[in-house]
Amino acid sequence: MSDKFKLLLKQIHFPQHEEAYNEIKSGSIESVKLFKSKRQWFFVFSFRNLLSYETFTLFDNLLHSSFDSLGAKVSYMINVEDISCDQSLLEAYFSYALDILKSSHFSIYSLFSNLGIEISNNSISVKAPAHILRENLHERFIALIADVLSNVGLSNVSISVLEDKEASSSLEEAYETNKISLQEEAESQARQALQSIVQSSPVPPPQKHQAQNFAEKQSQRVASFDKAEITPMIEVNSEENRIVFEGYIFDVEQRETKTGRIIINFKVTDYTSSFAMQRWVKDSEELVKFGMIKKGNWVRVRGRIENNPFTHSLTMNVQDIKEISHTPRKDLMPEGQKRVEFHAHTNMSTMDAIPTVEELIDTAAFWGHPAVAITDHANVQSFPHGYHKAKKAGIKAIFGLEANLVEDKVPIVYNSENLELKEATYVVFDVETTGLSAVHNDLIQIAASKMHKGNIVEQFDEFIDPGYPLSAFTTELTGITDNHVKGAKPLVQVLQEFQEFCKGAVLVAHNATFDVGFMNANYERHQLPTISQPVIDTLEFARNLYPEYKRHGLGPLTKRFGVALDHHHMANYDAEATGRLLFIFIKDVFEKHGLTNLEQLNTELVSDDSYKKSRVKHATLYVQNQTGLKNIFKLVSLSNVSYFEGVARIPRKVLDEYREGIIVGSACADGEVFDTLLSHGIDKAVEVAKYYDFIEVMPPAIYAPLIAKDLIKDEEAIEQLIRDLIEVANRLDKPVLATGNVHYINPEDAIYREIIVRALGQGAMINRPIGKGENAQPAPLPEAHFRTTNEMLDEFAFLGKDLAYEIVVANTQAMANQIEEVEVVKKDLYTPYIDRAEEQVAEMTYAKAFELYGNPLPDIIDLRIEKELSSILGNGFAVIYLASQMLVNRSNERGYLVGSRGSVGSSFVATMIGITEVNPMPPHYLCPKCQHSEFITDGSYGSGFDLPDKECSECGTEYKKDGQDIPFETFLGFDGDKVPDIDLNFSGDDQPSAHLDVRDIFGEQYAFRAGTVGTVADRTAYGFVKGYERDYNKFYRDAEVDRLAMGVAGVKRNTGQHPGGIVVIPNYMDVYDFTPVQYPADDVTAAWQTTHFNFHDIDENVLKLDILGHDDPTMIRKLQDLSGIDPKDIRADDPDVMKLFSGTEVLGVTPEQIGTSTGVLGIPEFGTNFVRGMVEETHPTTFAELLQLSGLSHGTDVWLGNAQDLIKEGIATLKTVIGCRDDIMVYLMHAGLDPKMAFTIMERVRKGMWLKISEEERNGYIQAMRENNVPDWYIESCGKIKYMFPKAHAAAYVMMALRVAYFKVHHPIYYYCAYFSIRAKAFELKTMSAGLDAVKARMEDIKEKRQRNEATNLENDLFTTLEIVNEMLERGFTFGQLDLYKSQATEFLIEGDTLIPPFIALEGLGENVAKQLVAAREEGEFLSKTELRKRGGLSSTLVERLDEMGILGNMPEDNQLSLFDDFF
């Protein structure tokens, strides 16, 4: 005790004889401050340990009372060296903190003092209703409590406030109930007041209509509701009463409270904004009155707008509601006079369009259009759905795409001649213009440098007055002002002088097509000769000479080569810089390629892949007939596989090669006809348009963004462009089609596209900002909704009625009539051909059956094989079975077991030929010696593994036991004609080899990974909306955010591949008969190509093999390698293994030691928290019950709210509840139902259709079930199920799980080694190697974080690992340190009872580095940390981490030994 502290204790009369004195005397005063003016003292005390609460309160009271007696104030802070405390002490201090708040912050104290509090291990969790969390009141509360606790020494206590959902619900209900009761009370008081007035008033003379009855009042209320003024939602931003909205319900949720009341929460939009709405109803009977509140309905609502304290947003409490009719847009033209849309995008246009193809086709059909075209950007992924939808809707679908057309080779030199590059004279020039169109914009500067052998010999620089003020955009871009051009020479004079300046020279420009195009257009306009001398384009020169550079613009190139460019976009500076670059290029092209002649640049430098840098132009391609469909599939494939560069490109020569059966349209403003017309005029456009079958024109509104981009002056210019496009077509006698460039259905949907497109960011071309600085904004998007015929005619009314009708209706109908109906998706299954597949399957089946069951076969086996083979061979499925068998057999030969998934284990043929281990026959005994068998067919056993041990009645050999009693119908359907879906679980280590086996068996050109299409997910859509809100200064209420996110979700974002699915094309066809192909995620370096279509779209037409990677086979292989035990020899009914499911004794530990009451931690299928809970509730003892658990855990609404309750209430047992789908059919057949009906009931239940089928059908099944004594609880259970797990799948999983469990019980060190090597996802070596206490402490730490929802995904994975570490340590095994010379790269090493971790278990050390480190140590010892870094490939951080863990011992920093080291 310090002297000052001892003096203080004496002055406050702290009793020295009390126990408290012995505790407090370790204290000291660290510092003291006196604020004289305030007569206030502030102490900082220090104690070794946290004071007991009794001692603390005694000290606190004496301290304050002593200073109070002196008329002074005192405050203090306590620092504690050891701040550990038990729960009761923390609770006491927490109560003290609340008392402190009571006097200083009573409002917060009163708010929180009655909340639920959970205290444990330096952690305080407070449970609070949602509105407290939403108002952020808890943040202030936490800060205040934390301050008080910190001042008394508890600075390390974490405090969190979690939502008390039960309290939230109760408060919300109470709030509504109280509000209703207040309303009722007010109405009652009003009635009483009215009655009092009536009673005190003289009785009026009798009237003919004395009083209105209730019905009349009600009708008046309804009439007022019907006539009420409708308020747009966007106008309501505060609480208001009796507001009336009309809108569309886009989301509905109902929930029932504990008291039986029901709240209907729904969201309505009028497309100006959206509102959340609420309606409370007393019970389910009253709920019927509000049946109109369902998604998709239009309603009129009246109610009060209130700020809901629970959602913290404006919400309408609905008083009146009625369904209203909503008239969608209609096409008003008569039948036969309706247009065909030839340019429409669906949500498969990547991040660019909104409607599904179904919505597009439904709209066209509703309007009575005879056909509609699908033209997504560069893909045809909506074809299959469009094909099916069009057939259903009775409308012709025209299948097309908007392709990215590129030139095959872009020349470097135009008008090439035989000239030596070093000897030629060059005129390097640049022009500045008022815009990009040589037709609609004007020259304002021509500048040039005449150069010879790298020297400037003459210069040209003239401004040109366009005759009107320059736009701000032009001045900002070029730096040229009106003052520059004012008084300049006439244009003709400048052109003539420039032609004279260029005589005898080679012209040079960067992006020469623009500059030359502008010059030629002006030459032609003034009857001057166009450019005929050679022209070098330095942009293409750079692209071909330096293909490794990503950017070849003038700015990036001058920076790279150190060429001055002081004023980019002023012609004189640009021209001189381009000239300097030219001579660098001439020097480099000689040094790199030996080229010296101008002609060689085109013939020898332009590469075959110059299409990669070629400017993309859009063209619309349409399938005209079946040949065209296959050719489009080829073009899409080639564009994605052979010519992909940023986007899928189609070189012109490739389109020419596959043009048969395809109609080519000129597309949009990004098409080359439109671009040529805009840039070079009608004559040039006519030349370009010759390539196309028809010319597209679009409504002026579609071209409007070009005005914002300064490419077109105004709307009048747009109309003239459209007339010019029609003139181009007329000169060539080609039809003109008016198309809408559709990107969404209705005008109000434009916001969805706006959000999606802006989410691409400013790097996307469509979002390139116009202007600079704060004013920079992307160009507006066009009005691209699906237009009706009359709307389209209105758009083109400026052309005159007849011409508008011709291009909108007549020509589109005529073109649609030229297009034939095609078959996009085939009707039948086309399996590959394998010689003698049917014979091989049959032979292998019978051979194995004879080997196991003898010859002749038992009738039950013979009949099952005959039944199955009849379906398999008769429907052409033999090749699917044989292919699967070959794959499984190859993996087996490599030493891996293969697990089956799905229902393939329902097929006995699959068992016999080795596809699956699951035997679907009824439970039976089988003699391994004499093949005698006994079958149990009365349903008394659910699995043959549960039969009691028995000796063969014929030869006395112990029987083997097998059979899971699974009907074949669950695999191929009742009639055996359902396409088999064989899913197989290969070892993750062997999966790549299994994939390659498919290629080897069927051929690389016939095997493709199953493609997938990734779309914008709900959460991502929400993020896009919030991002748009932020970036564009919008504000949306929550309901509107939800509405916008729903509109945005589902748009294509990327492509991918199924993790194990491989599609096999029959070898007598090619892939383009079914689908285009591509690379996953546009990764042209991927090893496999994928189907372009989502594989689900063609899975009934081609063979799909699911070759999945799984840990179980890998783990089994590891255990076999460690132990030498063949996993196939492990019994499925090992009694010690079964004990794992009822306790922990078999592991030699107590439940308290490992934190769970069973031994299933780390056992596949049973080790998750959810399934462990099921195991603890049910304590299964048989294999059949484990199958039940597997089915129950994988199903939906099979366990929770169903089987769990039946078992708890004693109505059924684990054995008798519905667990797997097949159990229904088997149980019902044993009960006496017809097999066909039993199968149908099973199918209805497993797909969640029981309550969706007609009441008549369902009642028929129920009657049959009751007639056969099926209990009511069983029937009710069927009605709750949404999805069921196949028994065969469960059996395969459980068999694998029990093999792993066998090693856990009987060979634990092998088990733990395999588990950590293969299954563990996260490691923390410092903790794992530090012993039990450290492991348990870290687990507690993560538990606390989980309670506060603060645990990271990594920590959650780590917790799972630590559970197994803890169990291993409790069983007497140890976890060793990393060892630089023992640890392996990726797998744990066994040393006696100790596991040595591998290098990859160290955080931040990857597999490749781990392998490099192991290889390096084989070469010799590491003599220093420097050597370890260099040879081992370790970073400095990793070396430091190893050193901190003590793994490097005394390893020196480098190899240079001190001269004196040897003396010591």
From Swiss-Prot:
- InterPro entries the record matches: DNA_pol3_alpha_NTPase_dom, DNA_pol3_finger, DNA_PolC-like_N_II, DNA_PolC-type_N_I, DnaE2/DnaE/PolC, DNAPol_HHH, DnaQ, Exonuclease_RNaseT/DNA_pol3
Entry keyword ATP-binding? no
Asked if Nuclease is a keyword of the record, the answer is: yes
Catalytic activity from the UniProt record: DNA(n) + a 2'-deoxyribonucleoside 5'-triphosphate = DNA(n+1) + diphosphate
User: Sorted alphabetically, which CDD domains does this protein's record hold?
Assistant: DEDDh, PHP_PolIIIA_POLC, polC_OBF
Q: Name one GO molecular function term.
A: 3'-5' exonuclease activity
Which segments constitute the Exonuclease domain? 426-582
**SMART domains listed in its UniProt record:** EXOIII, POLIIIAc
Q: Which GO terms describe its cellular component?
A: cytoplasm
* Enzyme Commission numbers on file: 2.7.7.7
* Gene Ontology BP term (one): DNA-templated DNA replication
> Which superkingdom?
Bacteria
Subcellular compartments: Cytoplasm
Q: Which UniProt keywords apply?
A: Cytoplasm, DNA replication, DNA-directed DNA polymerase, Exonuclease, Hydrolase, Nuclease, Nucleotidyltransferase, Transferase
Q: Looking at its record, which EC class is this enzyme?
A: transferase
Tell me which Pfam families the record gives. DNA_pol3_a_NI, DNA_pol3_a_NII, DNA_pol3_alpha, DNA_pol3_finger, HHH_6, PHP, RNase_T
Its biological function?
Required for replicative DNA synthesis. This DNA polymerase also exhibits 3' to 5' exonuclease activity.
Q: Which family does this protein fall into?
A: Belongs to the DNA polymerase type-C family. PolC subfamily.
Record-given protein name? DNA polymerase III PolC-type
**Which organism is the protein's source?**
Streptococcus thermophilus (strain ATCC BAA-250 / LMG 18311)
